[in-house]
Amino acid sequence: MQNSLSVPPRDEGESNIPSGTIQSRKGLQNKSQFRTIAPKIVPKVLTSRMLPCHSPSHSDQVNLGPSINSKPLGMSTQNYALMQVAGQEGTFSLVALPHVASAQPIQKPRMSLPENLKLPIPRYQPPRNSKGSRKKPILIFPKSGCSKAPAQTQMCPQMSPSPPHHPELLYKPSPFEEVPSLEQAPASISTAALTNGSDHGDLRPPVTNTHGSLNPPATPASPTPEEPAKQDLTDLSGKAHFVSKITSSKPSAVVSEKFKEQVYLAKTMTSLSPAILGNAVQLISSVPKGKLPIPPYSRMKTTEVYKIKSDANIAGFSLPGPKADCDKISSTTEGFNAATKVASKLPVPQVSQQSACESAFCPPTKLDLNHKTKLNSGAAKRKGRKWKVPDEILAFQGKRRKCIINKCRDGKERVKNDPQEFRDQKLGTLKKYRSIMPKPIMVIPTLASLASPTIQSQMLGGLGQDVLLNNSLTPKYLGCKQDNSSSPKPSSVFRNGFSGIKKPWHRCHVCNHHFQFKQHLQDHMNTHTNRRPYSCRICRKSYVRPGSLSTHMKLHHGENRLKKLMCCEFCAKVFGHIRVYFGHLKEVHRVVISTEPAPSELQPGDIPKNRDVSVQGMEGSLERENKSNLEEDFLLNQAGEVKLQIKCGRCQITAQSFAEIKFHLLYVHGEEIQGRLQEGTFPGSKGTQEELVQHASHDWKRHPERGKPEKVHSSSEESHACPRLKRQLHLHQNGVEMPIENEGPQSGTNKPRETCQGPECPGLHTVLLWSRSGFNCLLCAEMLGQKEDLLHHWKHQHNCEDPSKLWAILNTVSNQGVIELSSEAEK
């Protein structure tokens, strides 16, 4: 049977297409060999899936390479693809269907041809990045479906010992649908291997499934139930084993083919050789069953099968990539083993990855790892390392805590790094963090950075899953970093809190306010006790805080502002503020000052004029405290027109000067006057009188009821207040009294007199003491040009002992040089 099987494929392989199917199977092996040398040939072989090749002898395999190179160019894939019907006979693969039957599959390979041609392009790119593919299994590991991964591991051992499972695999088309997904996405070699494993019983229907529904099976690959998934996984495992043989060594592949044919003959399956070269994957999976007992190959096969399955699952989600390439698979398996070893050596990243995989994915992934490690030589050690992982975590946490404590002591704050920033960091920045951060923290970003490019090279769906893995890994890693960065922050805040607590040394027991300085607390307590310890030495105004007093001194008593000290006419006290002076006069001496004109001087047109002038001047002064020189000059010019009205607070008698009120207080109320009447010391000067007029008018404006005319008192003392003052003044001056009496008629006749119109001033007349023309002598009718001449005249002509004192008295009594004298004094 072996010879018959081998001879007819040789004869009919050249003429008939079924032998081409047989040759295509071996061509795949040789193709894997040439693939390493010249990968561009792969797409051509895929297009001519059923190349005419003969028995699995070594010589045929050697000749397959050139035949494959020449025939796919000239031969049409339609004829070869149709020869899969030969498997339905079940007797011999050499018996092929007529060319009429091949016309049907011709259309199907047309659909697959452009796809196969496009597939090898991405296939060549990943083998260039062999390192990336080696890194790939680390992250691809969790990507595989939870249910599919254990199924793969379980089915692979079952395939080898049990031959009866082989027909079951051939009979089911569902794995067949998943296989084409690998045909499109993985590569041309994988598709050829898948097609070679066509069913013995039904070859055409699986062909229709493979070619007709290439795209649909890609999607159901993931959601298929467990049973079809297992079958598909078994088919894939068979393919993986077959591909691994090709990748391991060419002679091994040849031996495997011979062994496969023998196994099939023993199983009484005459059509095994053509079926293997058919489009179904199931028969190919049976061949690795025999090879599984070999320990070295079994390791590679299991890893490759697992990866092919993961690639198949990924193919249902993502774009076509380097999935079934022989070189690539071998590199990925080696990379997977190496990467797992490295990961086991690295404690922190391994723990984080495994924990992330456990949390993000199903536990079957763990089962796959356990099964895989059992097949591998270092399984026990890896398990031990896995159990040691918690210890490593504890050690790492202890180191991290120590670092945190040291950082807290140093008071250094570190900024939190986002996971994206972490991925985007360059090697230079990583080196910087190596010097700063602990080593385990450095390892995780490197693994993440290595894993991310491999997934990007494979597929977009893989990228999404890698993002999930990275996200699952990053929280723990970031948690470590956040602990490192956030832990010093509380320490710094704690210190700042201490510094903040130290600042409020003093607390107010009333309102619980804190103050840094004791003096501030004392000033604050004055607000609760209404105590004003800071008083102005000039105006006696008190304040709670020293700052208020300094402000007051700058505003009211500063050097830049001209201050006029006010001297009290009764007690000789000095006041810097006019209002304080007025308050003193009112409270102590019972004297009220205002600008209301006396009733004796009331005239129809004078009252509004004088009041308007005084009010205007007062309003201007109130609006601005720092008045300009123009306003001062205006007030100085208008001060002569405004007359002060000084009232006695006891008897309501008004006087126009302080001298009159002094005499009134002295002779009527018996109050002693402490001040001396000296020239230049009286408040009748222009500056002082100006301020008096200003503030008195303001005070009168605020109290308009004071502007009403006083009621006429019946007492003779009040009605004749002014004449009595004059009389007392003249009587007080003994030296002047006699000359007045003697020379009264002369002076009365020479000086103009004006009688006061009204009942209040009967018998009063005015005498001019001085005017623009000169100074008049009250004792005689003589007029002198200067004041010195008048004083000399009084001294020599009228024998006056102190003419300056007499001038001061007359000047105080007079109002703008006008002296009012009664008729009695004149007599």
Swiss-Prot record:
Region spans: Disordered: 1-31, 117-173, 193-232, 682-723
Record's keyword annotation contains Heme: no
PROSITE patterns (alphabetical): ZINC_FINGER_C2H2_1, ZINC_FINGER_C2H2_2
Subcellular location: Nucleus
Name of this chain's protein: Zinc finger protein 438
Comp. bias intervals (Pro residues): 217-226
Zinc finger motifs (C2H2-type), residue ranges: 506-528, 534-556, 566-589, 775-798
Principal place of residence: nucleus
CC terms in the record's Gene Ontology section: nucleus
Family annotation (PANTHER family): ZINC FINGER PROTEIN (PTHR24408), ZINC FINGER PROTEIN 438 (PTHR24408:SF23)
Function: Acts as a transcriptional repressor.
Gene Ontology biological-process annotations: negative regulation of DNA-templated transcription
Gene that this polypeptide is encoded by: ZNF438
Any GO MF annotation of the entry: DNA-binding transcription factor activity, RNA polymerase II-specific
Chain intervals with Polar residues compositional bias: 16-31, 150-159
Alphabetical keyword list: DNA-binding, Metal-binding, Nucleus, Repeat, Repressor, Transcription, Transcription regulation, Zinc, Zinc-finger
Biased composition range(s): Basic and acidic residues: 688-699, 706-721
Organism: Pongo abelii (Sumatran orangutan)
